[in-house]
Amino acid sequence: MSVARGRLWCMNQIPVEQVLGRYFSASAAGRHPATVERYGRVLAHLRFFLEQEGDSTVSADVGALLALERQFEPEGAFERLLGAEQLVYALPRFLSPPWLLPDFHDRLAQISLVSRLVQWLCSRELVDSRWHRHAVMQTRAAAEKARRRATT
């Protein structure tokens, strides 16, 4: 276990990689194979986004921890090191135009999955919606804005 990973467990958070695995598995359960594939594309895109942009959504201290973790294992640092509380701050940017998937149906799935992900995180108390209200509201607003853009 790396130094940074040890810090995560001290913070008592479930790593983003486990959060996303559980959420996307639950979301795909019983769905049509085409929908499961679409959800897989959204998950892969979210993981790519977190690798590319995740640092810009966290504090300087957390960014320094991510840089340290990448010295040990370059790929997947955000998912290994951080928890749901940091993920919720990254989600609004994932719904911004540069990060929306090009395929119409994939894009709608991306918007819907992220909107439901925030609710899922709050309902399972992985994110305190009162403490992180701003990030939760920003994600919901970003989802609504992206949904309007996608359907008009």
Question: Which role does the model predict for each range below?
Answer:
Residues 24-28, 54, 95, 99, ...:
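Generic secondary-structure transition motif, activating predominantly at the C-termini of alpha-helices
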Residues 1-10:
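Short, Lys/Arg-enriched N-terminal segments with co-localized hydrophobic residues
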Residues 21, 38, 131-134:
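Charge-rich alpha-helical segments
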Residues 57-68, 123-152:
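Short, charged hinge/linker segments at domain and secondary-structure junctions
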Residues 32-123:
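Non-catalytic DNA-binding core/recognition domains of DNA-processing enzymes
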Residues 10-20:
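N-terminal DNA-binding module of tyrosine recombinases/phage integrases
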